[in-house]
Amino acid sequence: MASNNDSIKKTLGVVIGLSLVCSIIVSTAAVGLRDKQKANAVLDKQSKIVEVAGIEANGKKVPELYAEYIEPRLVDFATGEFVEEAADGSKAANYDQRKAAKDNATSIKLTAEQDKAKIIRRANTGIVYLVKNGDDVSKVIIPVHGNGLWSMMYAFVAVETDGNTVSGITYYEQGETPGLGGEVENPSWRAQWVGKKLFDENHKPAIKVVKGGAPAGSEHGVDGLSGATLTGNGVQGTFDFWLGDMGFGPFLAKVRDGGLN
C-alpha cells in the first residue's frame, strides 16, 4: 500500500511540475508575443505616416525615415496651441490619444450636437505630426477618426503649410464592408483628396463627400462611395468634427496664420 501511495505521489509531482513548466513557457511566450505585436503596431503606424507624408524611402527603413523627417507634437484642443506634455504627463513620443479619450480626467464627453463623428469622447490633448526637412516644416499630418457603418475608421490627413490644402490621406484602420465602405483604402479614391481645400473662404469646414460624384473641378468635393452611403456619411461626419472648433480647427487656423514658423 505504501508503495502505491509513493507511486501516486510521484506521478502527481511529475504532473504538477510539468504543468508549472508549461504555464511558465506559455506565459513567457505570451509576453513576448504581446511585445512583438506592440512593436509591429508602432511600425505599421509609422509606415502609414511616412506614406501619407510622401517621403521617398531611398533605401532607408521606416523607423529611420520616421526619425529623420517626422516630429510628433502635442496640441491643446481648446486653444490650438502646442503643449509640451499632456494632462497625464505624457510627452508626444509616447502619448496615446485613444487611451486619453477613455479617461474622464483627460477627456470630455461630447454632446449629441457636438459629436458629428460619433466618437462619444474626445481627448483634451491631440497629437499631430510635423513633416520636416531640417528645420523647415513642409506639411502637417492630423489624425482623424469617426464611426462608419460597422466600425470606427481611423485616418491620417496630410495638410500643406497653408493649413488648408490636402496633400494626402490614408485610412489605416477600419472594418467596413470590403468592396463597398472598405474602398476608403482604395488608392484611386484617396487620390481624389489631393489638392482639395478643407475650408471655404470664411474658414469654415467645407469638405463634402458627394453621393453620385463630386462636380468636376470642385475645390471641396470628393466622390461618395458607391453602395456605401452610410460609410460616406461617416467620412463626412469625421471631417465635419475634426475640422471644427472641437477638433483641429483652432490648430489649423494657427497653421494658416504662420503658426508653424
UniProtKB/Swiss-Prot annotation:
Primary enzyme class: translocase
Protein name (database record): Na(+)-translocating NADH-quinone reductase subunit C
Gene name as annotated: nqrC
Gene Ontology CC terms, in alphabetical order: plasma membrane
Membrane topology of the entry: Single-pass membrane protein
Keyword entries, A-Z: Cell inner membrane, Cell membrane, Flavoprotein, FMN, Ion transport, Membrane, NAD, Phosphoprotein, Sodium, Sodium transport, Translocase, Transmembrane, Transmembrane helix, Transport, Ubiquinone
Coiled-coil portions: none
Keyword Transport (UniProt): yes
Higher taxonomy: Bacteria, Pseudomonadati, Pseudomonadota, Gammaproteobacteria, Vibrionales
One GO-annotated biological process of the protein: sodium ion transport
SMART domains reported in the protein's UniProt record: FMN_bind
